[in-house]
């Protein structure tokens, strides 16, 4: 991932309602949620929700699919994982005692000897 792409993804998430929507979709899993369920989950009117879903979709963080009368939205896990990897890929490369900034799961593995 290039820095410009990361900035676009982070900009899309840098708004409270959009971040709440994205987190709800991440929690829902790959099947996603219908727009009405998202609106309920984040207590947002349909017109406002539509705007935010469009922003998240344009950034590449959310996918949509039609199923009958309903549109289901889901998080794009590949994009999310790519962003997380980008953010942490050079974590502490220049620091001594790098274990202090390693992700928690990695620290737990190191402590258990796995």
Residue ranges and their predicted role:
Residues 45-46, 52:
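Short coil turns linking two alpha-helices in DNA-binding domains
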Residues 1-5, 26-27, 77-114:
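Amphipathic alpha-helical dimerization/coiled-coil segments
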Residues 49, 56, 73:
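Divalent metal-coordination and catalytic microenvironments
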Residues 40, 57-58:
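Alpha-helical residues within the helix-turn-helix
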């Amino acid at each position: 991932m290039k820095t410009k792409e990361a900035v676009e993804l982070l900009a899309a998430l840098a708004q409270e309602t959009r971040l709440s929507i994205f987190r709800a979709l991440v929690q829902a899993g790959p099947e996603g949620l219908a727009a009405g369920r998202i609106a309920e989950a984040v207590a947002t009117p349909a017109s406002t929700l539509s705007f935010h879903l469009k922003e998240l979709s344009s950034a590449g963080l959310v996918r949509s699919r039609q199923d009958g009368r309903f549109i289901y939205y889901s998080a794009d896990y590949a994009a999310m994982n790519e962003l997380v990897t980008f953010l942490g890929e050079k974590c502490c490369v220049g620091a001594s005692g790098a274990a202090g900034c390693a992700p928690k799961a990695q620290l737990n593995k190191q402590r258990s000897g796995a």
